[in-house]
């Protein structure tokens, strides 16, 4: 019993250490930026309440190197817009409760209408505009505080941009490959669950298709965010200009990954849906090859191609043996999954050449 507890503790400790190791460098950068922001605003420029500079730096940098520059730009623009709107409402209505409600309504409405492109992604811009407008009314008796907030936001956000774009920009190729791997892992898991369902239909929980679909869509949404951020980093960070063509190739190839997700979800619906027909024996084999090929798509493309070829042969058998409409549809979906998997395996590698 004690030995088992020690093993579990050791495994948990290794997992914690691995999790911390992956974010230790971004956290270190955030800590340095927060300290610099406080030093510049409090010690150099003598702002008595310079707390917003390190706060804005931490909000922009966070514990990950993804989306830092985007958050910094959204925060700076949002703070500036909120201060302008807050000053206008204060000049007309003062700083009473009615003015507070009006300024929040106007700030949120204008921010939603003004949000375009990079600024529109996420809620940072909208929230910062509303918060800044509120603070203008709260500190209306001390106008210098308002402009110090804008200056502190510029310092904190500016330092975040310097660190995330000029000094330590994330590697967009690594970002894209990591997000792609997460999507492939989710696809592999749902295919493996389909294999188990076909082998023993009673072993799978009734709600597993919904949970699997939620995870797939969550990972796909993450890939969409990473694609936008990777393109921005490759375009604006001088240290990453050399990988622009590779980022473009990986970004364009992501469409095949989205098609694979769609095909696999459709396949899961036909296999795990209620009232399905008895499945032919080759279905188990083709699902096994699809799951194995998806799991090896990045680690071993040659082996993944072998599994894809085996799945294609089995899919052809399913198509030729299909007689009812359900079997024909299922065989066509399996063939689409194989085709999409093949395209995903043939992605461009980090050098820009075909993997």
From Swiss-Prot:
Its main location: membrane. The chain crosses the membrane at residues 22-42, 44-64, 71-91, 92-112, 119-139, 150-170. The keyword Transmembrane applies. Keywords: Cell membrane, Membrane, Transmembrane, Transmembrane helix, Transport. Disruption phenotype: Deletion of the gene confers resistance to arylamide compounds. The keyword Cell membrane applies. It is a multi-pass membrane protein. Signal peptide: none annotated. InterPro entries: Memb_transporter_dom (IPR049453). May be involved in the import of arylamide compounds. This is Putative arylamide transporter. It comes from Mycobacterium tuberculosis (strain ATCC 25618 / H37Rv).
């Amino acid at each position: 019993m004690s030995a088992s507890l020690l093993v579990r503790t050791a495994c948990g400790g290794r997992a914690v250490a691995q999790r911390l190791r992956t974010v230790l460098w971004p956290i270190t950068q955030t800590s340095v930026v927060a300290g610099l922001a406080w030093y510049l605003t409090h010690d150099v420029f003598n702002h008595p309440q310079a707390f917003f500079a390190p706060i804005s730096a931490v909000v922009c940098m966070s514990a990950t190197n993804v989306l830092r520059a985007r958050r910094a730009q959204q925060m700076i623009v949002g703070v500036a817009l909120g201060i302008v709107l807050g000053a206008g409402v204060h000049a007309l209505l003062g700083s009473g409760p009615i003015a507070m409600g009006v300024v929040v309504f106007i700030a949120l409405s204008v921010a939603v209408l003004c949000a375009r492109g990079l600024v529109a992604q996420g809620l940072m811009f909208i929230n910062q505009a509303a918060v800044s407008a509120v603070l203008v009314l709260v500190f209306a008796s001390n106008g210098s505080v308002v402009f110090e907030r804008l200056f502190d936001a510029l310092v904190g956000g500016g330092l975040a941009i310097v660190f995330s774009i000029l000094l330590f920009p994330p590697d967009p190729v690594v970002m894209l490959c990591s997000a792609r791997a997460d999507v492939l892992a989710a696809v592999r898991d749902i295919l493996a669950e389909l294999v188990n369902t076909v082998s023993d239909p009673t072993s799978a929980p009734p709600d597993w298709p919904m949970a699997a679909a939620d995870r797939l869509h969550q990972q796909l949404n993450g890939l969409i965010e990473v694609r936008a951020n990777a393109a921005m980093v490759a375009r604006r960070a001088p240290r990453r200009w050399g990988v622009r063509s590779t980022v473009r190739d990986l970004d364009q190839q992501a469409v095949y990954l989205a098609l694979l997700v769609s095909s696999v979800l459709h396949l899961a619906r036909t296999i795990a849906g209620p009232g399905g027909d008895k499945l032919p024996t080759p279905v188990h084999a083709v699902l096994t090859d699809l799951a194995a090929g998806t799991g090896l798509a990045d680690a071993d493309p040659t082996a993944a191609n072998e599994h894809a070829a085996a799945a294609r042969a089995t899919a052809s058998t399913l198509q030729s043996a299909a007689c009812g409409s359900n079997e024909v549809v299922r065989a066509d979906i399996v063939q689409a999954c194989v085709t999409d998997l093949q395209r995903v395996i043939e992605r461009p590698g980090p050098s820009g050449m075909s993997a």
